């Protein structure tokens, strides 16, 4: 019972870190990156579909992304979706593919993106702590119902705290890495 609760909590914490990693990867760093476009969707036959599924995305240069739709009729929709996104880029359509020049970030924009990265990291840490709280409640329930002894539950709580600290540290490292990428000129 205790092992199950700890395993479940660790699995959920792992997912929270993965979500944080994905969230942080969508923050633009001033370098071209195909992941920048993972959250942009277009209406494709009535379904919101990510453009990463509708086109090949290549990075031939550090500040240039080339998007080649699998279907030529999606060119205009993809261009519009990118232009309307919060990426702050201006795509150019040459009739066969879309070129996106990634502009240099201003100092002010870098600071803004660092704040955004820290905020996403904090949200992920709150998520991990909520998972810990729920697991602690489960451990207290197990103790109360007599399914495990006081010592066993105490050890499990220490293990849970250690695991929580480990995942919070991972999130801090992700944010620190992203901050370094953003502030690098």
Curated annotation (Swiss-Prot):
SUPFAM superfamilies the UniProt entry points to: Ribosome recycling factor, RRF
Disulphide bridges: none
Keywords: Cytoplasm, Protein biosynthesis
GO terms for MF: ribosomal large subunit binding; translation termination factor activity
Residue span of region Disordered: 144-164
InterPro entries (UniProt xref): Ribosome_recyc_fac, Ribosome_recyc_fac_dom, RRF_sf
Gene Ontology biological process terms from the UniProt entry: translation; translational termination
Source organism, top-level taxon: Bacteria
Family matches, as CDD domains: RRF
Magnesium found in the keyword field: no
GO cellular component: cytoplasm; peptidoglycan-based cell wall; plasma membrane
Residue ranges that the Swiss-Prot or TrEMBL entry lists as coiled coil: none
Subcellular location: Cytoplasm
Protein family according to the UniProt entry: Belongs to the RRF family.
Protein function: Responsible for the release of ribosomes from messenger RNA at the termination of protein biosynthesis. May increase the efficiency of translation by recycling ribosomes from one round of translation to another.
Record-given protein name: Ribosome-recycling factor
Organism expressing this protein natively: Mycobacterium tuberculosis (strain ATCC 25618 / H37Rv)
């Amino acid at each position: 019972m205790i092992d199950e609760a700890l395993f479940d909590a660790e699995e959920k914490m792992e997912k929270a870190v993965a979500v944080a990693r994905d969230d942080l990867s969508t923050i633009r760093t001033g370098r071209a990156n195909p992941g920048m476009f993972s959250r942009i969707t277009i209406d494709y036959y009535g379904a919101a579909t990510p453009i990463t599924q509708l086109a090949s995305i290549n990075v031939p240069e550090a500040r240039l992304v080339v998007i080649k739709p699998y279907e030529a009729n999606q060119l205009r929709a993809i261009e519009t979706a990118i232009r309307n996104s919060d990426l702050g880029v201006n795509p150019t359509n040459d009739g066969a593919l879309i070129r996106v020049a990634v502009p240099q970030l201003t100092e002010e924009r870098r600071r803004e993106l660092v704040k955004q990265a820290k905020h996403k990291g904090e949200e992920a840490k709150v998520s991990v702590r909520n998972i810990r709280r729920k697991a602690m409640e489960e451990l207290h329930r197990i103790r109360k119902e007599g399914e495990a002894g006081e010592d066993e539950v105490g050890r499990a709580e220490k293990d849970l705290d250690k695991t929580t600290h480990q995942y919070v540290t991972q999130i801090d490292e992700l944010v620190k890495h992203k901050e370094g990428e953003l502030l690098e000129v």
